[in-house]
Amino acid sequence: MFKRILIANRGEIAVRVFRACRELEIEPVVVYSQADREALHVQLAEQAYCIGPARSADSYLNVNAILTVAQAAGCDAIHPGYGFLSENADFADACEAAGITFIGPSGDVIRAMGNKAAARKLMQSAGVPVVPGSDGAVDTAEQAKALADSIGYPVLIKASAGGGGRGMRRVYEPEQLIPLFEEARSESLACFGSGEMYLEKLIVNPRHIEFQIMADGQGHVIQLGDRDCSIQRRNQKLLEESPSKALTPELRERMGAAAVAAARAAGYVNAGTIEFVLAPDGQFY
């Protein structure tokens, strides 16, 4: 059990982690930007450190400042919450190098799952169903068009490094593919610094189903149930319903087993989410 944890976040998640630390009799240490000095998590804490000005890049994304505070305060772990540095592989590596536990997956796992084209291959090797599409990245718009012609339209162009709907385009007609591919690639380069793209068959009118998983680092992985995240705006979830009314007991069991297999294949440790697309015909990917 940890003795002292630095919470590298703000707002609701910082308060929730703070309360969890108190319940477990772990001493919480919080950080804040100059704009958040009156925030609730700061008011609750006995140890609170300013890590920079209001701009997130200079505070909550400032790896050196956060690690300096963690070491000075004698923290043996850092909880990143969500957003900010929670999926930053370099930060996870920096914590390990400093002898501080990063409460989350390792840097290698973050990198492996952060590249969606590589993650597709990993899931296929583990027997987890993936949406029909490219085997890895596609290098050119012409290659993407040839693949789309073979699997049939509509298709989905996706950025390997993408997220939040950026670097993604739906293509319904062959003549749309090349211009939309270049458009998606340009957006991906601007947003993520990578122009690597891949292609999938577009599942029309799907449900977005997630399974919560936990892995302890000793080979034990469990799933803790499902939630339906299909109500979205611009590819961002608005509401989650748990459990999903769309799943039969048999389908829920199969998807839960696939979620556990996916986490094992990735070598995932800690709490996490495995996301599925559920097609109208009951097939999941």
Which role does the model predict for each range below?
Residues M1-Y285:
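N-terminal beta-alpha lobe that positions the nucleotide/phosphoryl donor
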